[in-house]
Swiss-Prot record:
Catalyzes the hydrolysis of N-succinyl-L,L-diaminopimelic acid (SDAP), forming succinate and LL-2,6-diaminopimelate (DAP), an intermediate involved in the bacterial biosynthesis of lysine and meso-diaminopimelic acid, an essential component of bacterial cell walls. This is Succinyl-diaminopimelate desuccinylase. SUPFAM superfamilies: Bacterial exopeptidase dimerisation domain (SSF55031), Zn-dependent exopeptidases (SSF53187). It comes from Shewanella sp. (strain MR-7). The active site is at D74, E139. Binds 2 Zn(2+) or Co(2+) ions per subunit. It catalyses: N-succinyl-(2S,6S)-2,6-diaminopimelate + H2O = (2S,6S)-2,6-diaminopimelate + succinate. Zn(2+) 2 binds at D105, E140, H354. HAMAP family: DapE. InterPro entries: ArgE/DapE_CS, Bact_exopeptidase_dim_dom, DapE_proteobac, Peptidase_M20, Peptidase_M20_dimer, Peptidase_M20A. The gene is dapE. Zn(2+) 1 binds at H72, D105, E168. Gene3D superfamilies: Zn peptidases (3.40.630.10). Its EC number is 3.5.1.18.
């Protein structure tokens, strides 16, 4: 095992960002550091603070098309510190990997974006169009005051993004083997099934909501929602939480609470899913309350300049072809896509994200910056 320093500019900036313990929704000066670098190469910096969330909109140029790097400075909590090989906010290089919370998700991407942009502007100071950065500290949290609020601000003044490249860790086994050219929609239900509480020895005086709901839940879990399509897998429904009872063995509960989530394709809409679930509840004659939370619409970036440029960049820098996919969770791309922007996600290998000993290969950081730079050249030269 070797511990070494590294002079790669992307690695050095990543280390500076990791050293700022920006657990969501904190930013801890990460955006200030980025803003200083961007201002030095001609970006107009516009901080946007909404309640406890720090956001930044930075732009170089006044004309279209607008290429936007999007990402987040916040990270998830470090968790059990005793399980980390190194302190999570003390960036450490071991055997060619940089360890620290946020190394892969997504401070490495942020550093690569900055360095790629600096190199591009140095070579092309009079580039056509505009380059922008949309950065938030509210991606890992409730995503209320982050990207969605910035987009609302931009939309209100008719400022449009043409292409957005989100730095989420899209890669699986090696850098660039997968890019995300879309995401499924996400819809969450919070269901309360009502009964009558009572003593288990006197069931005729009570009404057990667990017993009543069981056939519904069985049918819900076995329902086929759609077949998916060439871009999206079939819609998936997963029960995430069930809670009922007082903890005592002799009490029939009065209510049952169930939370379930849909990750849905473009073959259905949220409205169709809601209609089908509520029809199922009615068919089972349940007394219930239900609330729905829209977490994001599905989106897809098909063939076109952004996907072409990204494919070209990955092939040029890595020597292999990428695989566009729509699998996985949601990202802030879901807030950008409804504006009409084309959105892709390209970032490091995601094997250690949200885990103890999160790390990124330092050679991947430099390659990622080169990919980003080639994408800029393909779109704005």
């Amino acid at each position: 095992m070797t511990h070494a320093s590294n002079t790669h500019p992307v690695t050095e900036l990543t280390k500076e960002l990791i050293a700022r313990p920006s657990v969501t929704p904190l930013d801890e000066g990460c955006q200030t550091l980025m803003a200083e670098r961007l201002a030095a190469i001609g970006f107009n910096i516009e901080p946007m603070v909404f309640e406890d969330t720090t956001n930044m909109w930075a732009r170089r140029g006044n004309e279209g098309p607008v290429f936007c790097f999007a990402g987040h400075t916040d990270v998830v909590p470090a968790g059990d510190l005793s399980r980390w090989h190194t302190p999570p906010f003390e960036p450490t290089i071991i055997d060619g990997y940089l360890y620290g919370r946020g190394a892969a998700d997504m401070k490495g991407s942020l550093a690569a974006m900055i360095v790629a942009t600096e190199r591009f502007v140095a070579k092309h100071p009079n580039h056509p169009g505009s380059i922008a950065f949309l950065i938030t500290s509210d991606e890992e949290g409730p995503f209320i005051n982050g990207t969605t609020r910035v987009i609302d601000t931009l939309e209100a003044r008719n400022e449009k993004i043409t292409w957005a490249l989100v730095g989420e860790p899209s890669s699986t086994l090696k850098l660039g083997d997968v890019v995300k050219n879309g995401r499924r929609g996400s819809l969450t239900a919070n269901l309360t099934v009502k009964g009558i509480q009572g003593h288990v020895a006197y069931p005729h005086l009570a009404d057990n909501p667990i017993h009543k709901a069981a056939p519904f839940l069985a049918e819900l879990s076995q329902t086929h929602w759609d077949n998916g399509n060439e871009f999206f897998p079939p819609t998936s429904m997963q029960i995430a939480n069930i809670n009922g009872g007082t903890g005592a063995s002799n009490v029939i509960p009065g209510t049952l609470e169930v939370m379930f989530n849909f990750r849905y394709s473009t073959e259905v809409t949220a409205e169709i899913l809601i209609e089908r679930v509520e029809a199922l509840l009615t068919a089972h004659e349940l007394d219930y309350d239900i609330s729905w939370t829209f977490n994001g619409l599905p989106f897809l970036t098909g063939e076109g300049p952004l996907l072409d440029a990204t494919r070209h960049a990955i092939r040029q820098i890595t020597g292999y072809d990428t695989d566009p996919q729509t699998t996985g969770g949601t990202s802030d791309g879901r807030f950008i896509a409804p504006t009409g922007a084309k959105v892709l996600e390209l970032g490091p290998v995601n094997a250690t994200i949200h885990k103890v000993n999160e790390c990124v290969k330092i050679d991947d950081l430099e390659q990622l910056a080169l990919c980003y730079e080639v994408i800029l050249e393909q779109l704005l030269c």
